[in-house]
Every structure is written in structure tokens, then in C-alpha cells.
Amino acid sequence: MVNLVCDAIIPDGPMKDVEEIEKSILTTYKKSIWSKFLKAINDFDMIQDGDKIAIGVSGGKDSLLLVKLFQELKKDRRKKFDFKAVSLNPGFRHSDLDNFKNNLDKLNIECEIIDTNIWEIANEKAKDYPCFLCAKMRRGILYTQVEELGFNKLTLGHHFDDVIETTLINMFYAGTMKTMTPKVPSTSGKLELIRPLIYVKEADIIDYTKTNGIRAMNCGCTIEAGKTSSKRREVKDLLAALEEKNPGIKQSVFNSMKNINLDYVFGYTGGKEVE
């Protein structure tokens, strides 16, 4: 049976002091998180001097970590850039929103929260499957707001496992070879989307979150009550089973997106449909 419920991350204890959390990034998680974050930025030339970067913050484990990493990067001063955390409130419950704001306060994160009624609209217009419309609306509003605020880049918290799962979802269910790229222009062309966590494994993000006592938002959706995509869950469970029997499977899938031999595929469409 496929588990359709988002896995809750239960902290090991109360949240640690922000100074201790920040120190852990450069000590305990230097190899598994910090170094991989820096490597992705350098490998894909994600940040240039003068950049104005918005960090999309959902309140979940990935985006909360991402902001802390950028705070540490800013201290380095080798790259001259500005950044700001930006979050959409699609209609969170008061308790979830309060927890989110409490996390921001304790983690010393300044974040602009933009209130919307996305969930209400998505549920009214697409009752059977509101998730697709919700995601589309959230992207559209976030991109527009970030552009209007004068940013030229938007940072998203997608990690190593997101890349692998997306690759297989596209293969299994859409019949296409496509994945999340480290950086890509937005549809309007006014923004560049960057993913500095692309080398960071979800298990390490979970460990960082639990160990530091961060009660990150799990799934604040008031409509689907914690359910996640059945396709993504199927792929996640499949990968876990394969990785247990054959350690390195995930890395191989990830590497495959960097090693496509066009001489040995049926056709290359360049984003266009094959006739």
C-alpha cells in the first residue's frame, strides 16, 4: 500500500540557540551540507557580484536551512550580493502560521510574508485535484512578487533527492527525459531560478533539522490534509528499496542527468515534440 501522508519530522528536543545551530552548519554539517552548498554554487556559477537574490521560504525544513546557509555565505564577504527571504501564505491555519513565525524569530530570519487566498481559490476551481492549480498559482504569484521587488534571482530549496525523484517521475509517468536543473530562467525571462541544495541529500537535511530541534512545517495544506503526490511517494519508496539493496543507485540516477549520450537515444527534441 502506498503511503500518501507526508512524513512528520519530530525534533530530538527543544530548539537549540541560534548561535549553536549556525555553528553546527560549519562543524557537524560542514561536509554533508555546507561544502555541498558551496560546491553547487561554484560548479554552476549561481551567484555573481551585484546579485539581488530572493529566497523562497515555505516554512519547511529545506527552505529554513537554505536561509541559514545564505546568512553564513553573506558573512564570507567573498561574493558581494544581497538577499531577502520571501514567503507566500497561501492560507495557512493560524497555528501553522504562528509556528512558522516563531521559527523565523528563533532562527533570526527576517522574512517578508505575502498573504494570499490561493488554497481557497484552488479548492473552488479544481475540487477533484487542486494541487496542480495551487502549485501553478503559487509559482506565478511568487515570481511576479519577486520581480516587482527588484530581485534578479530566486533561490529554491530543491535538494538532491528532489532531482532524482523528478527525473524518474518524468520518465515513468510523462515519457520524457527531464529533471530539475541547477539554474534556469523563469518563464518571463526576468528572473533566474537557482537551486544551491542540489547536491545536499534529504537525509542530511532531516538530521540537521531534528538534531537542532527545529519544528519545521511539515504540510500546512488545509485542503489535502497532509497528502502528497502518490506518484512522488511511489518513486520515493521505490528508490528507498533499491538504495537499500544497491547503495549508490540514487547517485547513479543523479549522474545520469549529467551523462546523456545523444548518439544512443532515439531522438533529441530540444524541448519540442517529436513528429
Positions of the model-derived regions?
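Alpha-helix boundary/capping detector
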Residues: 96, 130, 168, 172, ...
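A general structural signal for short secondary-structure boundary/capping elements
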Residues: 131-136, 158, 199-203, 242-245, ...
